[in-house]
A protein has these predicted regions:
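Terminal substrate-recognition subdomain of acyl/acetyltransferases
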Residues: 155-164
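A short beta-loop-alpha structural element at the N-terminal edge
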Residues: 4-16
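Conserved G/P- and acidic residue-centered "switch" motifs that form tight phosphate/ATP-binding loops
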Residues: 97
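Conserved GNAT acetyl-CoA-binding A-motif
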Residues: 103, 110-121
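Conserved catalytic-core motifs of GNAT/GCN5-like acyltransferases
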Residues: 117-123, 134, 139-155
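Glycine-rich acetyl-CoA-binding "A-motif" of GNAT/NAT acetyltransferases
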Residues: 63-67, 128, 154
Length: 164
């Protein structure tokens, strides 16, 4: 099945919201446990489009949205050179190189936009994501111990960054 990597468009909002919800409900990857309300998803995407913030989606087969990657610039002036990376893939599309394609597209767009630093947080147990981030050049800057608690289980969170 062919998977296309494209800049997000308004027509992708419903699929993006569904994908966010699926990945969030796994409780293993994102900082929220269910997808945001549709109006919040819509506002996020439209703001990214309006301001040219890097956000890409992976579309499989008949345009099913199966993943995303975005780099949201920091709104505070002293941090405006940096952006926070967020990404996710539906479970059945992991391990196929789609994440690598998504992140490379997003990083390329961040360079064009003039961003200097991309940062992210990742749970220490998410070895595949950490390997992906290292593969594209991210370095670990630090760790917050027991920073996440899901269903009574604590997890460490790594801080990673890449200078463009």
């Amino acid at each position: 099945m062919t998977v296309q990597i494209l800049p997000i468009a308004a027509s992708h909002i419903p699929g993006f919201g569904r994908a966010l919800d699926v990945v969030a409900r796994e409780k293993r990857y994102l900082s929220f446990l269910e997808g945001p309300p549709p109006e919040a998803v819509r506002a996020f995407v439209l703001d990214n489009i309006e301001h040219g913030h890097p956000q890409f989606v992976a579309l499989a087969g008949d345009e099913k949205l199966v993943g995303w990657c975005d780099a949201r610039p920091n709104s505070k002036p002293i941090y405006a050179h940096s952006a926070t990376l967020g990404m996710g893939l539906l479970p059945e599309f992991r391990g196929r190189g789609i994440g690598t394609r998504l992140i490379r597209s997003t990083l390329d767009a961040a360079r064009v936009k003039g961003l200097h630093r991309i940062e992210l947080t990742v749970r220490e147990a998410n070895a595949s994501a950490i390997a992906l981030y290292r593969k594209v050049g991210f370095l670990t800057e630090g760790m917050r111990m027991d920073a996440v608690c899901v269903d009574g289980s604590y997890e460490n969170v790594l801080f990673m960054a890449l200078l463009l």
